[in-house]
Curated annotation (Swiss-Prot):
This is Potassium channel toxin alpha-KTx 2.7. The record marks 28 as: Basic residue of the functional dyad. It comes from Centruroides limpidus. Belongs to the short scorpion toxin superfamily. Potassium channel inhibitor family. Alpha-KTx 02 subfamily. SUPFAM superfamilies: Scorpion toxin-like. Inhibitor of voltage-gated potassium channels (Kv). This protein is capable of displacing the binding of radio-labeled noxiustoxin (AC P08815) to rat brain synaptosomes with high affinity (about 100 pM). It is also capable of inhibiting transient potassium-currents (resembling I(A)-type currents), in cultured rat cerebellar granule cells. About 50% of the peak currents are reduced by application of a 1.5 uM solution of this toxin. Is lethal to mice (when less than 100 ug are injected). It holds the Pfam family Toxin_2. PROSITE patterns: SCORP_SHORT_TOXIN. Has the structural arrangement of an alpha-helix connected to a beta-sheet by disulfide bonds (CSalpha/beta). Disulfide bonds join 7-29, 13-34, 17-36. It comes from the Eukaryota.
Amino acid sequence: TVIDVKCTSPKQCLPPCKEIYGRHAGAKCMNGKCKC
């Protein structure tokens, strides 16, 4: 799921993804937006 969080690296996406989807969430940075 793409969430409305800007990013330059996947590390920036982990905290918001974990917050929404729980601690087992994975995260990627695609086109400047986080994808969980």
